[in-house]
Amino acid sequence: KNDVVTNLESRVAEDIFWKQLPLTEVRIKNKVVKLNAVRTGEKVTSRYVLYNTGNNPLFIEYVNPDCSCTGYEVSDSITFPGDSLQIMLKFDTTGKAGINFMSAVVKANTSTALYKLSFVVDVLE
């Protein structure tokens, strides 16, 4: 097999895996976070808590920030019913003076497949 076929098979298997997961429910404490004003060049972090309120394990398939200036960290890629996990969005304010509204899309095995997590921060010169 060549690399193209192997990669295609891998992506198909992953797609089948995600489609076969049982759905669960999630509650997100704050989908929009207002951060304190900071000086340009500082790095800031916004935190979001996702509670698994359903009957099946919650899997985070991906987190997709809308800007390369925003990274992310997930405390756990899976959480069981009754438990929670955290997603942290990390923003580098270098060269971003002014009011910044940033977001990331999160995909999980829930009836609402996509969630938008956002934050706003005023970056001072």
Regions found by a protein language model. Give the residues of each.
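Short, exposed beta-strand-loop hairpins at the edges of beta-sheets
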Residues: 105-112
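Beta-strand-rich interaction surfaces with strong enrichment in secreted/lumenal proteins
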Residues: 34-36, 74-79, 92
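Surface-exposed binding patches on compact interaction domains or structured appendages
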Residues: 55-83
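Surface-exposed loops/turns
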Residues: 40, 81, 96-97
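Short, surface-exposed loop/turn segments at beta-strand-coil junctions that are enriched for proline
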Residues: 92-98, 109
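Beta-sheet-dominated interaction scaffolds and their linkers
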Residues: 3-53, 120-125
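Short strand-edge motifs at loop-to-beta-strand transitions and within beta-strands
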Residues: 33, 83-89
